[in-house]
Regions:
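ATP-dependent helicase/translocase motor core
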Residues: 1-278, 287, 291-303, 324-327, ...
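Conserved RecA-like helicase motor-core motifs
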Residues: 61-64, 278, 293, 300-317, ...
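Conserved RecA-like P-loop NTPase helicase motor core
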Residues: 143, 334, 364, 377, ...
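Conserved RecA-like ASCE P-loop NTPase motor core of nucleic-acid helicases/translocases
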Residues: 251-252, 276-285, 511-519
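Conserved C-terminal RecA-like helicase domain
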Residues: 326, 465-469, 475-575
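Conserved RecA-like ASCE ATPase "motif II neighborhood" in helicase/translocase motors
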Residues: 327-386, 563, 577-578
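Post-DEXD/H (motif II) to motif III coupling segment of the RecA-like Helicase ATP-binding lobe
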Residues: 365-446
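Interdomain helical connector at the RecA1-RecA2 junction of SF1/SF2 helicase-like NTPases
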Residues: 410-510
Length: 633
């Protein structure tokens, strides 16, 4: 693992040096290039915009596809015609820098600015004036009239990529003039022709009215969704926020209170009212996406039909989005590769108009064993920056669900519009309470994790898995508990702890146990030690299993199969994990949690605790138990 991290770090350094210019000469050249671009005039900026438009599916060539050169809309072609003439008196020429035609339909106008100029207010006067003064001979190309505006969609751009710190000076500013209360706002990339046509076919006012008056009886059908009161309230609060015109809504619901079924009810309600065209269900792990898809295929909603039989759903391994697609399930990492990290994104900002974010507390990677993908980010701030970018890339309303709201969560989604806490759920009888934790200490922990001067310690090489010749300590060495099994390996210590833990567990019972390890190697040692401890009692090896991202050689399908086995079968009864099972996994029979690591993140810790809160009447579960081996508390 350490060697792999080192190799990836070196690769990352090379990539970043090439991309951003680490040497003084490269930085100077880059600075000169940026300075030169800031001095570009409008004509030069339009050449840059041409390329951006072509990547989004438009024919664009500011020099040749020009009104004055005879370019006109053509059936079957999507052309951004430059310098389109209008009767506007804003300038003596009266032309818009670009007019967007889908076939022969005029759907949008755009004004380009020099890269150094602000663009935020350009739409307010200039582009609106163009839209209100279309020439009489061009009226047949228009698709409606809205409060005097003959073109529905307006843009302004100076060619610069969007930066939050330079909000008014960057991005592509967009306004839908069909509703008077709409305000201009920046988007990250150009809409494709199909994006604009889908927007054009949507009546948000009528859809909001339908949404507010929607029949919720399907939510309480005992043979179908069968939602609880608090789940219905959560959907109602999200609906109110959407009808009120809010672009974000955060639902804070305790782990184990049925967020996935709540999401299913929300999705179905939104699609039935036609409020949204296409919904993205965003998860941060493949296993969570698979679990959601299972629910979508299992729960009956209307006339004994499940969601996947009523609407087209794209599973987590299906990237092809078409006009019929209504729901797509994807991971954050997958979307990053298809949008902001892609040279040529295959998803435009209009691909989804509602994003539902599962487990929106995401962002505790510093306290986790990072995946190879995560190692390629500079740090937690860099990861969260890209997480936010991919969520905000789409021109969509965002509804997020989390059990553990944190600062970075509310910064993106705002304060919760609805909260249903763990304590409320316990009082209402929907979750189980927990016993006081058992604290297990050893002499080594009690003695402050200290090695004495003169002791001989074997050195472990993680790259070769070999123990090297012992070294005599020249001085005392102290270790923090968080470094156990990360920097120091103590087999005797681990064995003593697990011997004590084993007295509380019965691998042959219906009560399942989840043990949290420091890393994958530590998980292997725990499994091996427990099997050794239980061997004299005739316990099957299958009763104890490691379930991490490296199980079955990292084969995702096999990992999902093992997770389902843990949930549905007698064995494994004891699962040892690192981070794979910390969030979102629904195994009601988990009764015991064992912490063989120090947890530095409140968010992660609460998510871990949530693995054992679900009701499981089949085994008579009334509470959860915890064994913590984290040293002095």
């Amino acid at each position: 693992q350490e060697r792999k991290i080192e190799e990836l770090t070196k690769q990352l350094a090379v990539v970043k040096t090439a991309a951003s210019g680490k040497t003084q000469k490269e930085r100077a050249r880059r600075s000169e290039s940026v300075s030169a671009m800031m001095n570009w005039n409008e004509a030069q900026t339009r050449c840059l915009i041409d390329e951006q438009l072509r990547l989004s599916g438009w024919e664009a060539d500011t020099q040749n596809l020009r009104y004055s050169k005879g370019t006109r809309p053509v059936k079957g072609r999507n052309i951004a015609i430059s310098e389109w003439s209008t009767n506007s008196a804003f300038y003596k020429n009266g032309y818009a820098d670009y007019a967007f035609f889908v076939g022969e339909k005029l759907v949008a106008l755009m004004d380009a600015k020099k890269m150094s100029e602000d663009v935020a207010s350009t739409i307010d006067v200039q582009v609106k004036d163009y839209a209100a003064h279309i020439k009489p001979e061009d009226i047949p190309h228009t698709v409606g009239n809205w409060n005097g505006y003959q073109v529905p969609f307006l843009f302004a751009s100076n060619g610069r990529a969007y930066l939050e710190q330079l909000r008014t000076k960057s991005g592509i500013w967009f306004l839908d003039v069909r509703e008077q209360e709409n305000q201009p706002y920046p988007i990250r990339n150009w809409f494709s022709p199909s994006d604009l046509m889908e927007k054009l076919g949507q009546n948000t006012v009528a859809a909001n009215q339908a949404l507010a008056a929607a029949d919720n009886s399907f939510m309480t059908d005992p043979n179908g969704l069968n939602l609880r009161d608090y789940q219905i309230k959560a959907i109602d609060k999200a609906t109110e926020a959407i009808v009120d015109g809010k672009r974000t809504a955060l639902l804070a619901m305790a782990t184990g209170t049925g967020k996935t079924r709540t999401v299913l009810g929300l999705i179905y309600k939104m699609l039935e009212s036609k409020r949204f065209r296409r919904i993205l269900f965003l998860v941060d792990r493949v296993s969570l996406g698979e679990q959601a898809m299972d629910t979508f295929k299992d729960v009956k909603l209307k006339e004994l039909l499940t969601l996947d039989k009523i609407y087209e759903i794209k599973a987590i391994d299906d990237n092809i989005i078409n006009l019929e697609t209504k729901v797509s399930i994807s991971t954050v990492q997958g979307l990053l590769k298809r949008t902001i990290l892609a040279e040529e994104p295959d998803l435009m900002p209009g691909a989804f108009d509602l994003i539902i974010v599962d487990e929106a507390h995401r962002g505790y990677i510093l306290d986790r064993e990072m995946t190879e993908e995560e190692i390629l980010y500079d740090n937690q701030d860099d990861y969260m920056s890209k997480y936010k970018q991919v969520i905000e890339y789409f021109d969509a309303v965002k509804v997020a669900l989390t059990a553990t709201p944190a600062l970075h969560t509310t910064e993106i989604f705002g304060e919760p519009v609805y909260t249903y806490s763990y304590r409320e759920a316990v009082i209402d009888g929907w979750l189980v309470d927990h016993d006081p934790p058992y604290l297990i200490n050893t002499d080594f922990i009690e003695n402050d994790a200290q090695f004495k001067k003169g002791e001989t310690l074997a050195q472990y090489d993680p790259n070769t898995n070999e123990l090297l010749n012992g070294a005599v300590l020249d001085d005392e060495m102290d270790f923090d508990v968080s470094e156990f099994n990360r920097k120091i390996v103590l087999p005797d210590h681990t064995h003593k702890v697990l011997e004590e833990v084993s007295t509380y567990l019965n691998p042959e019972s219906g009560e399942k146990t989840l043990i949290f390890a420091v890393n994958d190697a530590h998980a292997d040692r725990i499994v091996d030690t427990l099997r050794e401890i239980y061997k004299p009692y005739g316990i099957s090896n299958d009763a104890i299993m490691k379930i991490t991202g490296k199980t079955a050689g990292g084969n995702k399908k096999k990992i999902l199969q093992v997770i389902k086995q843990f949930k549905n079968n007698q064995y494994p009864n004891i699962a040892v994990t690192v981070d794979l099972l910390t969030t979102g996994i629904d195994v009601p029979a988990i009764c015991n949690l064992v912490f063989m690591r120090k947890i530095n993140s409140r968010i992660l810790f609460e998510q871990m605790l949530g693995r054992a809160t679900r009701l499981c009447p089949e085994i008579g579960k009334t509470h959860r138990s915890e064994e913590r081996r984290v040293g002095k508390e």
